[in-house]
Amino acid sequence: ELVRTNQAFARFVPDEFLNFLGKESVIDINLGDQVQRQMTILFTDIRNFTSLSEQMTPRENFALINSYLNHMAPVVRQHGGIIDKYIGDSIMALYPDSPVQAIKSALVMRGLLKEYNRGRKRAGYPPLDMGIGIHTGVLMLGIIGEEHRMESTVISDAVNTASRLENLTKLFGVSIIISQAALDADPACRDFCELRYLGAIPLKGRSQGLGVYEVLHPDDSTYEAKIANRELFHNCIAAWEALQDRKQGSRDVFAQYLKVFPEDSALNYYLNRSEYFFLFPDGDKK
């Protein structure tokens, strides 16, 4: 009976969570059990799901979410990750060993999404798109609640940062963004995949900008162009970050890049920022 209880419980709280807390069984868990350790957090989210959801019935909504998660969630486990929770169409996953595992998961997910969309197209449904944010930091894992209702949770600013990186993918028009902190946690990250520096980006709750990178994936139609123009883009960002007066010179910084690779969606972030500084030169740069 205890085995069946643990198996049922594992569908809601992963066995790895019990291991982190030093517990053998769900019945050993107590309110306030906790542990602190460094991990990598991966956040995924379906783009524009709200507008898509409004066009479907409740049954269709849940069918889509469960179908999508059934394709994506196993990828996390196959690469050493733990699914902490589903938040609607979003996945929050933890990787206790290396951010390389999270990068592998993200790239496989992108490939699976392409295959998944082929099936949706054949069925007459619109394609889905997704954003992925990856960050590494110290987490507190533990049990919260009260006597009659307890649940596992993760508390950390690193979780908020990973979620904000996923949101950044929309602003930059890219699929996968990883933080400098994640790359620094394991040097193997830089050897495993192609990266493109996107800048030191101001995030809510941080006094300094966080260095972020795009993880390039071969399925991207602009993959080769991004690699070919990577150094020029990096130089433009460095020049932009060094500007004292972004109202006057910010657009000039990207003028050459616009001529070479105007299709680069990441340009929109900086051009929009340039417009902001033109309209509000004394405003909050965040």
Spell out what each predicted region is.
Residues 1-5, 28-108, 152:
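Catalytic NTP-binding/metal-coordinating core of nucleotidyl cyclase/transferase enzymes
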Residues 143-146:
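Cytochrome P450 core scaffold surrounding the K-helix E-X-X-R motif
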Residues 58, 99, 245-248, 264:
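TPR-repeat structural position
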Residues 139, 169-241, 251-283:
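Cytosolic regulatory/linker segments at or just downstream of nucleotide-handling modules
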Residues 65-81, 92, 96-132, 136, ...:
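Alpha-helical scaffold within the catalytic cores of cyclic-nucleotide enzymes
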Residues 1-36, 268, 282:
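Regulatory cytosolic signal-relay segments
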Residues 33-37, 127, 208:
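Short, flexible loop/turn motifs enriched in small residues
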